[in-house]
Amino acid sequence: MSYLFTSESVSEGHPDKVADQISDAILDYFIAYDTNSKVACETLVTSGQIILAGEVKSKVYLDIPEIVREVIEGIGYTKSEYHFESKSSGIISLIHEQSNDISRGIERESPLDQGAGDQGMMFGYATNETANYIPLSLDLSHQLMKELTNIRKYEPELMPYLRPDAKSQVTIRYHDNDIPKSIDTIVISTQHDEFDTAEVMQSKIMKDVRNILIPRIKANYSENIQALFDDKIKYYINPTGKFVIGGPHGDAGLTGRKIIVDTYGGRGAHGGGAFSGKDPSKVDRSAAYAARHIAKNLVAAGVSEEVLVQVSYAIGVTKPINIFVNTYGKSKVKLTDSQIAERVLEIFDLRPKAIENRLKLRNPIYKETAAYGHMGRLPKIVKKVFTPRYANVAKSKDLKKELKVELFTWEKLDYVKKIRKIFQ
C-alpha cells in the first residue's frame, strides 16, 4: 500500500515571514556591531503597522525603524494599494533590556561554561530522499515559492500581476518502502493585481503556473525526481478564485508562526521553539541547528537512511540533559540507536558555546534563514554590508560594516569522514 504525505511553504511576502525577516534583520544588525549582543525580538505586522517587542542586551543602539523599512522594501511592499508599504507604515518599538535574572543564569567566567538560554527540547532530522537531505514534499514547496519570487522580482514581464504574498503545498505519494512514487497534488495560492474578472484571472494564473513556473522547477531536479512530474498531478491554483487582498493587510503576521515550514515540513519532530529574532545563546535556535548538523552528517556518512536527533537543556545549565537518536529501523550499522547516540556525544560538543563556535553562529547570518527554510539550504560565504544611522554606533569611525560571513554552516557535510571512522 502506498501513502500520501504533504508539506507546505510560504513566500517571503507572507505576513508571518515578513515578521520573521524583520526580527532576524534586527538581530543581524545588533550582532554586526556587538557580537555579544543578546537578542529576543518579536514582530507583529498588520495593515499599515509594525509592532516590535522583546528584550536586548547590547552595547549598541540602532535605528530600528530604518532597518524595518529596509526589510519591507526589499520584500516588495512598495505600493500604497497593498495597505502595507515600506515608507508609510507606522512602526512602534517596545523593545527593552534583557532581564538580569536571565543573563546571570547564562554568563560564566569561562565562555565554554555558558549556560543554556532556556529550557526545552530541540530536534534535528535528515533523510536521503533528496540531495539536500530534507523531505521532497518540503523541498518542492520551497522551490515553488523561491522561483515564483524570482519571477516577481527579476522577470516581472513573465507574470506581471504577481504581488508578494504566496503559499505552496505539495503532496507526494510514497511506496511502502518510503521511496517517492509520484507527485499527487500541487497547491499554489499567489496574491495578484486585479486585472480582470475572477474567472479570467484564475485561468490566466493557472496557465502561467503550469507553463512557466512548473517547467522551471522540474528542470532543477535530477532525472528520477523529474520523472515524478507526470500528467496525473492535481493542480489547485488560487482555488478561492481570487487573491488580491493579501500580505499583512489580509492577515496579521507574527514572528515564529511558521516553525514547520522553517524545519522539516511535518517530518521528524519539533520541540516547539521558534528561531527568528533569537541570538545563538537561545538553544531553541542554536541546538536545533546543531541537531540538524548531526542528523545530516549521520545520513550522509551512511549510518542510516533517515535520522532524528533530540537534545534537551535546562536554563543556565551547560551540558544537555539528554541526546536521543531514532533511525526508524533504517540503520546501516550494527549498533542500537542508544549506542549511536553515545558515539554522537563523543564526536559533537553540545555545550551552547561550543555549538556557537563550531557553527560560527556569533555572526550576522540570520536574515537569510528567515524565508524558504532554515534547513536544506546551501552553505556559502557572502559579503554583507551594514550601515547604521545614528546613536552610539554613529559616533564610531567605522560607520559602515562590510563583513564576510558563512551562511547555513549547519548544512555542511564536514563531519562525514570523522563519523565514518568512528562507526566503521
Curated annotation (Swiss-Prot):
Pathway assigned in UniProt: Amino-acid biosynthesis; S-adenosyl-L-methionine biosynthesis; S-adenosyl-L-methionine from L-methionine: step 1/1
Q: Where in the cell is it found?
A: Cytoplasm
Output this protein's name.
S-adenosylmethionine synthase
Q: Where does L-methionine bind?
A: 55, 98, 251, 282
- GO CC terms in record: cytoplasm
Q: Name one GO biological process term.
A: one-carbon metabolic process
| Principal subcellular localisation of the protein | cytoplasm
Which HAMAP family does the annotation name?
S_AdoMet_synth1
Organism of derivation: Azobacteroides pseudotrichonymphae genomovar. CFP2
Q: Which family does it belong to?
A: Belongs to the AdoMet synthase family.
Q: Where is this region: Flexible loop?
A: 98-108
Which Gene3D superfamilies does this one have? 3.30.300.10
Q: How is the cofactor bound?
A: Binds 2 divalent ions per subunit.
**Looking at the keywords, is Cell inner membrane present?**
no
Q: Tell me the keywords, alphabetical order.
A: ATP-binding, Cytoplasm, Magnesium, Metal-binding, Nucleotide-binding, One-carbon metabolism, Potassium, Transferase
